[in-house]
Curated annotation (Swiss-Prot):
Matching Pfam families: Cpn60_TCP1, PIP5K
Cofactor: Mg(2+); Mn(2+)
Biased segments, Polar residues type: 973-987, 1150-1159
Coiled-coil ranges from the UniProt annotation: none
SUPFAM superfamilies: GroEL apical domain-like, SAICAR synthase-like
Residue numbers spanned by region Disordered: 1-110, 533-592, 925-944, 967-987, 1003-1022, 1137-1159
Organism: Arabidopsis thaliana (Mouse-ear cress)
Name the record gives this protein: Putative 1-phosphatidylinositol-3-phosphate 5-kinase FAB1D
Complex formation: Component of the PI(3,5)P2 regulatory complex at least composed of ATG18, SAC/FIG4, FAB1 and VAC14.
Gene: FAB1D
Reaction(s) catalysed (UniProt annotation): a 1,2-diacyl-sn-glycero-3-phospho-(1D-myo-inositol-3-phosphate) + ATP = a 1,2-diacyl-sn-glycero-3-phospho-(1D-myo-inositol-3,5-bisphosphate) + ADP + H(+)
Length: 1456
């Protein structure tokens, strides 16, 4: 808790009474890298002399000045300066230099002294004694100081009375009883707290050890009193002893006096008797004669003969006092406790009076005739020190008094807390009041964006938001801005009872630690009363009638516009149903729980700032207020200032360290510094401790920092519990939230200082960024984000290709038109036909532009990004369809007779039929020769190789008879020209109709070409169902494009495209854009999801798209009929058209045999899907094996929005160059960033098969039972085999795992891969460090340097999930898994999930463990790979230790 030895036990011990070190058991895991250097530093530093107090200045690292929340210079430890004014830094006052005192006479020794233990002038201990005559100015300041203290105490008293009234009511007293007991309890507790003065050094600070409550069933209630002394239920040893003394001398004896003499017999010798007297009796007689006590109090028993000896000496003896009672008496009267073994003469202390009195408890009598019970009490009154008193309760039966006793015990603690806090806050006000008098205009604000709060005139509303604390919950009321402030608007409360426990619990009651607006206005904290919190409890301190309290509370609901009840604290919600029994019971429980909450849990650490090492690892310290291991504020500061308290880790002085205390969203940083002796503070010999504050962000016009004057801390403030001081620091104080006259916050912008002599402690407060731990979600969200501009770019590419297609076709038509001169009447019909086709081209171009615009608009509005990608595939299909139909249309014009003259026109010419076309048209003659008749140059068709190019790829339901092309018989063929019917070669009937022609090239060479026939006989069955055709032609490709577009893709492929499977060199030479589109898109798969607007396609370099195609096919098959399942069953939806059954069987058996041999067990259920065509030039063939398809589908039903969404996400992916991955292995993310596709090792593939059943059961139980888990969900295991067409059909197999992306929809700035091991787990970061995956040692180092705190709830959830998952992974013999932690600074989240949990602890890993343990890693250090049980233990311990949790709630006594 502190750097001193006196508090070391508080930091380390595991005690429910005093301190809880939440991570004590985990601190065995040390930073291995830093530990070696740290040990070297320790060895070197041990040579430093302990008594050397003056240190040479050392360079201070920048992180020391970071706590000042401002840019600063790196300077020596002696001269830390703010970098406030870069133009004139030399004039800046050092931040450590103490300002002038608020009262100069405080610096004069003997002018102002606090009461000491020997002061018995009757003044209250928490007030100052004025010694000597003070100047008029000092007297005036003292009057103001005392007035401030008086107002503080009055405010505290008003809050105290309200709590007492609630406690009495909760004790079950009637209204009448509550009335008089309320006044009595409040008076007694406040009087006792005012009188008590616990010692600071060497004695307990627990107030309950200085006060006792005794119940005496006699007299009346008003006779109850605070007895200024001690009362015990004891009597004198012998009845003849005196029972009353004035100023008696009291001797305290520990142990047993004398020895029992019952063992002596009549035969014992006189020598034995004398020996007993000399050994036991004589020392007692000697000490009595030397010290002359009046009263002897002995811890244990006293022998009979010694009792008589003491009686003979005229001394009153009381024995069986118990040691703790003697200690209380010793503390109060200042007399030592003597040991029976070493009784010696001592100067005994005395009290004012001693008496033993028998009291008749008439209220305990059962009836009037019964004997009234009596009680013998021993009174020690008027002790010389105010270190103990007793509250005597009288006036009713003992059972009733016991209830009052409980109320008194609680109330006294509250009163004591309040009194010390009031004194401390009064001192702080005195300090801050020295800065209020200065005008805000004297300050030069250095914050560029600083904007002062609006004035009352600029306030948008007269209603004021008032934070009201009920002790646990920060609530808000609105009070209309009226002058009297009596009307209350709306109370906003989450609870119906008096005390609410969530979410913030300043210990005991925040109301005690908060100033009301009335007090704030009086003290001058409020500069704009209409914009600051105010309080409603204006008359609390003047009311004592409890009946009026009850009546006022009952009438609150009906009279909410009337004045608030006098004792109704504004910080408690109004409960209109307080008479309800359940609410009453709940209120009592809440009050009891509240009063037991007397502690604070803080995260404590200590760091050597000069060396940059952690001397005290972060751990929890449970500080119970005013208990044994708590210390007063004065002692804490003295231990800080004691330069002889060397750090046990680095053997350095406290001055070299930074001390951190974190709670909820705040962190307190303490730094110690020795200032020059010349500038030291006065009164060090007298123990005077000063405090002051200085703004860290501004300067006044004379270039000095805005600073308060320093004030002397009062005795009561020095006695404040350090734990309570932390509570005041971390709770939201009204005046700390106010801005100073310079416009800066006292809380966040001011530095606070305490000083004693030449030692100064600087305290700075900063906000703690608390992170939440985000575990893998049970339900995966659909992606709504995609890389900016990517979709637009892809649509733009499709659009550009489409425009090029239409321009390519238009250019061809233009060249074709040029072949028909206007003067030649024979081609008038051709020119008209070409004009109509050009109009058709323009029309379809407009339609295309409109369609792609509409599709893009729809894609942008789709919520799921993956569906946008599917809509893009739809546009690619339409682009391909557009290219195909214009290819066929233009070829049909060239190769048919529609552009040739009619038979009547040909008779005009005597030379016979010759068709000339420079656009590449051919003329067919009887000798099967084609000549070029165009003098202007036609469309050349050079000789090229025969190529088979699939138009639309293989599709579901392809017929084997369509696999190969053929040329029909003579009677089925159709020539290009009606006069040449014998130009084709006969081929077998069973093939599709094709025309084989000899094409003469321009160089006279001859080649055999396959050209699709477009005759009418081919389209007989199609034309009957196609409806109206363009230009009256009945070929399918002359149908309107909108009509074709509306047809199902499968229907178009089956009915049209498969009958025109090949294209010739015509397209390659004359329609290059069309040829490019057909080449790129024709071999691509197209599988519809739901409808043809969403299409899944395959992309060769994106393996996830192959998986998506396979899953889409299986999904479509399942929607049609139940999917047959068997081990190694195959579904060949995308089979090679010419693949024979032998090849298929061979593939299936290959997978079967490999799986069986590898797994050595029954092979898992597999679904095999193959697709790809060997006729596709350069197109590989694929086969996909999906393991446990049904089980994975069931898992995806639980965690994914739908199966279709999952498939859509996998449809596109991008390579992901994640650092730390295996080289040449597949590692990709889906384009919507939702999933990760990772290639796994063969051993991992085999391991998963062995525990897959347990995995699915564990995940099912997690969903059904709601168990916490942080396993990154594996949603599919697929084996993708790629058979390349080149290189002899070489096969490449990829074992792929589909896993959720933990960093989905988050901006992760850095990632850690944590295995719980530190050896060889450090990686050097790159220049930018964005994509680096850091390891365990990096995480430990970063947590020490710049910790990332998590909330208590988040850490509990993480630990619970880690516990569940590691237990499961150990049960299936898995180790070497990692916790992936992504830091999202924008959302303040730590994204966590366990990954890489497919590797079992097989014999090869066991061998690796043995080798590394024996030969590689240092002694007593574990390698990364160890047995699953040891791995689980180490993994859990690391996560518990290094995830730092800031306490977000105040602790009660049960939190130990």
């Amino acid at each position: 808790m502190t750097p001193s030895n006196s508090l070391s036990s508080s930091e380390r011990s595991l005690s429910g009474e005093c301190s809880v070190d939440g991570n004590s058991c985990d601190r065995g895991i040390e930073d291995e890298c830093s530990s070696h250097s740290s040990q070297e530093d320790v060895e070197l530093t041990k040579e430093v002399k302990v008594d050397r107090l003056e240190r040479k200045s050392k360079s201070m690292p920048s992180d020391i000045l970071d706590i000042l929340d401002e840019k600063s210079k790196e300077n020596s430890v002696e001269n830390v300066q703010f970098l406030s004014d870069r133009e004139d830094d030399s004039d800046d006052v050092p931040v450590w230099e103490p300002p002038e005192p608020e009262n100069p006479e405080d610096e004069v020794d003997g002018v102002f002294a606090d009461d000491d233990d020997d002061c018995c002038d009757g003044s209250k201990w928490n007030k100052a004694s004025l010694l000597g005559e003070l100047s008029d100015e000092s007297s005036e300041k003292r009057k103001v100081y005392e007035e401030n203290r008086r107002v503080m105490l009055e405010e505290a008293d008003s809050k105290f009375k309200f709590i007492v009234s609630q406690l009495i009511k909760s004790a079950g007293f009637s209204i009448e009883e509550s009335g008089y007991w309320f006044e009595i309890v409040a008076r007694l507790c406040w009087e006792a707290a005012s009188m008590l003065k616990p010692a600071i050094d060497g004695k307990s600070v627990d107030p309950t050890e200085y006060i006792k409550v005794k119940c005496i069933a006699t007299g009346s209630c008003v006779d109850s009193e605070v007895f200024k002394g001690l009362v015990f239920k004891k009597h004198a040893a012998l009845k003849h002893m005196a029972t009353k003394y004035e100023h008696p001398r009291i001797m305290l004896v520990e142990g047993v006096l004398g020895h029992p003499i019952s063992g002596f017999s009549s035969l014992q010798s006189v020598n034995q008797d004398n020996e007993y007297l000399l050994k036991y009796v004589k020392p007692v007689v000697d000490i009595i004669e030397a010290s002359k006590p009046d009263v002897m109090l002995v811890e244990k028993s006293v022998s009979r003969d010694i009792q008589k000896t003491i009686l003979d000496k005229g001394v009153t003896l009381v024995f069986d006092m118990k040691l703790h009672r003697l200690q209380r008496i010793s503390r109060c009267i200042g007399s030592p406790i003597l040991s029976v073994d070493s009784l010696s003469s001592q100067k005994l202390k005395h009290c004012d009076s001693f008496r033993i009195e028998k009291i008749v408890e008439e209220h305990n009598a059962a009836g009037e005739s019964d004997k009234k019970p009596t009680k013998t009490l021993m009174f020690l009154e008027g002790c010389p020190t105010r270190l103990g008193c007793t509250i005597l309760l009288k006036g009713c039966h003992s059972e009733r008094l016991k209830k009052v006793k409980e109320v008194v015990q609680y109330s006294f603690i509250l009163a004591y807390h309040l009194m010390l806090e009031a004194s401390f806050l009064a001192d702080r006000h005195t300090m801050f009041s020295t800065i209020f008098a200065k005008e805000a205009t004297s300050c030069v604000v250095e914050i560029e964006n600083f904007s002062p709060s609006p004035s009352p005139r600029e306030s948008p509303s007269e209603a004021v938001d008032i934070p009201v604390s009920n002790g646990f919950d920060e609530q808000t009321i609105q009070i209309n801005g009226e002058a009297d402030g009596e009307k209350v608007g709306t109370w906003e409360s989450d609870g119906d009872h008096v005390f609410s426990h969530e979410p913030y619990n300043p210990v005991i009651f925040t109301g005690f630690s908060s100033l009301s607006a009335r007090l704030s206005k009086y003290l001058g904290f409020v500069q704009n009363p209409e914009s600051v919190p105010v309080s409603v409890d204006t008359d609390v301190s003047t009311t004592s009638n409890l009946d009026s309290i009850r009546e006022s509370e009952e009438d609150t609901a009906e009279k909410n516009e009337d004045k608030q009840p006098l004792l109704l604290d504004p910080e408690l919600p109004v409960n209109s149903s307080s008479d309800d029994g359940d609410n009453k019971s709940q209120t009592e429980n809440d009050i009891e729980s509240t009063l037991e909450s007397q502690s604070i849990l803080v995260l404590v650490s200590k760091r050597n700032a000069l060396r940059g090492i952690m001397c005290d690892q972060r751990h929890f310290s449970h500080i119970k207020f005013y208990k044994h291991f708590d210390v007063p504020l004065e002692k804490f500061l003295r231990d800080m200032f004691n330069q002889r308290n060397l750090c046990q880790t680095c053997v350095e002085f406290p001055e070299a360290h930074l001390y951190y205390y974190a709670h909820q969203n705040k962190q307190l940083t303490i730094q110690i510094k020795r200032i020059p002796v010349a500038k030291g503070l006065a009164g060090e010999a007298k123990g005077k401790i000063w405090m002051w504050s200085r703004c860290g962000k501004c300067k006044t016009k004379n270039a000095s920092r805005k600073s308060t004057k320093r004030v002397l801390i009062s005795t009561a403030a020095r006695s404040l519990s350090f734990g309570k001081f932390l509570e005041l620091s971390f709770s939201q104080q009204t005046f700390l939230n106010r801005s100073s006259s310079c416009g800066h916050s006292f809380d966040s912008d001011f530095l606070h200082f305490f000083g004693l002599g030449s030692m100064v402690a600087m305290l700075s407060y900063s906000q703690v960024a608390s992170y939440t731990v985000s575990l893998p979600p049970m339900k995966l969200e659909s992606s709504i984000l995609i890389k900016a501009g990517w979709l637009e770019k892809e649509f733009q590419t499709v659009f550009t290709k489409g425009i090029s297609l239409f321009e390519d076709a238009a250019g061809f038509l233009k060249r074709l038109r040029s072949q028909f001169t206007n003067s030649d009447l024979r081609y008038q019909r051709a020119r008209k036909l070409l004009s109509n086709i050009e109009e058709l081209l323009k029309h379809e171009r407009c339609i295309f532009e409109e369609n792609i615009k509409n599709s893009f608009d729809k894609a942008k509005t789709i919520d799921d990004v993956s569906h946008r990608l599917l809509r893009l595939n739809r546009m690619r299909w339409e682009l391909l369809l557009q290219a195909l139909i214009w290819n066929y249309r233009l070829q049909s014009l060239v190769l048919s007779d529609r552009l040739l003259p009619s038979s009547d026109e040909t008779k005009i010419y005597e030379q016979g039929l010759k068709t000339v076309s420079e656009a590449g048209m051919t003329r067919y003659e009887n000798d099967n020769k084609v000549s070029d008749s165009g003098s202007n140059g036609g469309i050349d068709t050079p000789l090229v190789e025969h190529k088979d190019i699939p138009i639309a790829g293989a599709s579901v339901g392809d017929n084997d008879q369509m696999a190969e092309s053929y040329v029909p018989e003579d009677n089925e063929s159709q020539t290009l020209c009606s006069s040449s019917p014998d130009t084709t070669s006969p081929i077998n009937n069973h093939f599709d109709t094709h025309l084989a022609v000899n094409v003469h090239s321009t160089n006279g060479q001859e080649a055999d070409k396959s050209i699709p026939v477009t005759g009418e006989s081919l389209d007989d069955e199609v034309s009957t169902s196609n409806g109206p055709h363009i230009l009256g032609w009945d070929e399918w490709f002359w149908l309107p494009f909108e009509e074709l577009r509306s047809k199902r893709i499968v229907d178009i492929e089956k009915e049209y495209l498969l009958k025109f499977e090949y294209v010739n060199n015509f397209t390659q030479e004359n329609l290059q854009t069309v040829n490019q589109i057909i080449t790129e898109e024709s071999s691509r798969l197209r599988i519809s999801l739901r409808d043809d607007d969403f299409i899944v396609s395959d992309y060769e370099d994106e393996l996830s798209s192959l998986i998506a195609c396979a899953l889409a096919h299986l999904n479509n098959e399942e929607s049609k009929k139940p999917l047959s399942r068997c081990i190694h069953g195959s579904l060949q939806g995308f089979l090679d058209n010419n693949q024979d059954s032998k090849q298929t069987d061979r593939d299936v058996s290959r997978f079967s045999s490999e799986s069986t041999n590898r797994l050595e067990t029954l092979p898992p259920p597999e679904v095999l899907v193959t697709f790809g065509s060997v006729k596709s030039v350069g197109k590989p063939k694929y086969s996909i094996v999906s393991l446990y398809a049904d089980d994975f589908r069931d898992l995806r039903k639980r965690c994914c929005s739908s199966e279709l969404d999952y498939i859509a996400s996998l449809s596109r992916c991008k390579p992901w160059d994640a650092k730390g991955g295996k080289s040449k292995s597949v590692f990709a993310k889906t384009l919507d960033d939702r999933f990760i596709v990772k290639e796994i090792k063969k051993t991992e593939y085999e391991s998963f098969v062995t525990f897959a059943t347990e995995y699915f059961k564990y995940m099912k139980d997690s969903y059904d039972l709601g168990n916490q888990t942080c396993l990154a969900k594996v949603l599919g295991i697929h084996q993708v085999t790629v058979r390349q067409p080149k290189g002899g059909g070489k096969e490449i197999r990829h074992d792929l795992m589909v896993m959720e992306n933990l960093s989905f929809s988050r901006k992760v700035t850095r990632q850690y891969d944590l295995k719980g091991a530190l050896h060889a787990r450090f990686t050097a970061t790159s220049a930018n460090g964005e994509d680096d995956v850091l390891l365990d040692q990096n995480f430990v180092n970063d947590m020490n340097k710049s910790p990332l705190y998590v909330s208590k709830t988040s850490k509990q959830n993480l630990q619970r999930a880690v516990y569940n998952d590691t237990s499961f992974l150990t049960s299936i013999n898995v180790m070497d898994y990692s916790l992936l932690v992504g830091v999202d600074d924008e959302n303040h989240e730590l994204v966590c999930g366990i990954i890489d949990y497919l590797r079992q602890y097989t014999w090869d890993k066991q061998l690796e463990t043995w080798v590394k343990s024996s030969l590689v890693v240092p002694k007593n250090v574990q390698p990364t790979v160890i047995s699953p049980i040891d791995y689980k233990t180490r993994f859990r311990k690391f996560m518990k230790t290094h995830f730092l949790c800031v306490p977000d709630q105040w602790c009660d006594q049960g939190d130990s």
